[in-house]
A protein has these predicted regions:
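Bacterial N-terminal signal peptides that target proteins for export
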Residues: 2-14
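C-terminal motif of bacterial Sec signal peptides marking the signal peptidase cleavage site
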Residues: 20-25
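Bacterial signal peptide processing site
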Residues: 27-29
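Short, glycine-/small- and polar/acidic-enriched structural segments
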Residues: 33-164, 171-172, 188-191, 207
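Small-molecule pocket liners
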Residues: 49, 117-123, 205-206, 216-220, ...
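Pocket-lining segment of extracytoplasmic ligand-binding domains
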Residues: 97, 170-171, 176-263
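Secondary-structure end/capping motifs
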Residues: 230-308
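Conserved C-terminal helix/tail region of periplasmic/extracytoplasmic solute-binding proteins
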Residues: 299-338
Length: 338
């Protein structure tokens, strides 16, 4: 087995738990200092994370160094941000909009890689709905997860059509609960997220409004303390992501199978997400393309009161990216499971 030479300080890292845990608002409540744990998330909206977890690459690569890998599931970008903020996570998956929001509000994170360029958000209506246009959303009840790309997709959609978030009633529900609310008639529309959205579509829900430009990239983020104290361990995570990117390109059907298994989807639905609505082969280095998207989203945060002022947005844009890890990504450092 390959052994990587590095000095681990890992002071301040959080304790592993016996089983995979879903991140909730209480994430990190029992977190204590541990010298030998890497806390990293997986999420159904981040297929590369599912590949890495499924293949066991981090465990194999880090075994000789005594580092235990603790996987925690992020139910949405807001939950990943909670995990990063509470230091229950060292590395977490969010949409770009959520990463900017967290940084602008003082969470000490850096974006160290891109994991996808997806079309993962849309405005979803139930089968047979009388909502035929965005204008028809005025006065309606819409499920959305605040602090995530679908929520900001909704805000941008309303603004583009001469409305504001105050013209609708937002039910702040986690993504899966939003689909449930749409399905049982509790809300009129849902700001959806794949892969749940693809499953809803298969069951008859309609993607009433789509706009690729309102989707931000998939951002992989890490806490500043982790990057400062454990840069080589952070590099290993990015190397594993590079290996997953290459593996996904060579094995798209197997990637869809992994997603289907974790998300509880039928394989045709998972295939739609992977093959039609996810670009996993995106350049992993954060840079100008992502910055331009966030520059458009940032002022919206101030307008709706999620960030206090534009100065905080500008400072976050200047300090959010650390491209050095993705620039040095090397999949050959990762040990495959035997």
């Amino acid at each position: 087995m390959k052994s990587l030479t590095r000095t681990h300080r890992l002071l301040g890292l959080t304790t592993a738990v016996a089983a995979t845990v879903a991140l909730t608002g209480c994430a990190g409540e029992n977190a204590e200092a541990s010298a030998e744990t890497l806390n990293v998330d997986f999420a159904t909206y981040n297929p590369l994370s599912l590949i890495i977890k499924d293949q066991g690459w981090l465990e194999e690569t880090l075994e000789d160094e005594g580092v235990e890998v603790n996987w925690l599931q992020s139910a949405g970008s807001n939950k990943a941000n909670e995990g990063l903020r509470s230091e229950a996570l060292h590395v977490g998956s969010t949409a770009g909009s959520a990463a900017l929001l967290a940084r602008a509000n003082g969470t000490p994170i850096k974006t160290i890689a891109m994991y996808s360029q997806p079309e993962w958000s849309a405005i979803v209506t139930p089968e047979g709905s009388d909502i035929a246009s965005v204008e028809d959303l005025r006065g309606k009840k819409i499920a959305a997860t605040k602090g995530t790309d679908p929520y900001f997709f909704l805000v941008q959609t309303l603004q583009e059509h001469g409305m504001t978030i105050d013209d609708v009633t937002v039910e702040n529900l986690q993504h899966a609960d939003g689909w449930s609310a749409l399905n049982n008639g509790s809300v009129d529309a849902w700001a959806g997220l794949d892969p749940i959205m693809a499953g809803a579509e298969e069951e008859g829900a309609e993607l009433m409004y789509r706009n690729l430009d309102f989707n931000t990239y998939g951002f992989l983020n890490a806490t500043e303390d982790f990057l400062e104290n454990e840069p080589e361990l952070a590099q290993t995570v990015i190397d594993a992501y590079q290996k997953a990117r290459e593996w996904a390109a060579e094995n798209p059907e197997e990637t869809a199978e992994i997603l289907a298994d974790v998300a509880g989807l039928e394989e045709p639905i998972a295939n739609k997400v992977i093959l039609e609505r996810s670009n996993l082969d995106v350049d992993p280095v954060p840079g100008d393309a992502q910055r331009s998207v966030l520059e458009a989203v940032g002022p919206i945060f101030v307008e709706i009161g999620d960030v206090s002022d534009q100065e905080s947005i500008d400072e976050a844009l200047e300090t959010l990216f650390d491209p050095s890890f993705a620039e040095n990504a090397d999949s050959s450092t990762i040990t495959e499971s035997s």
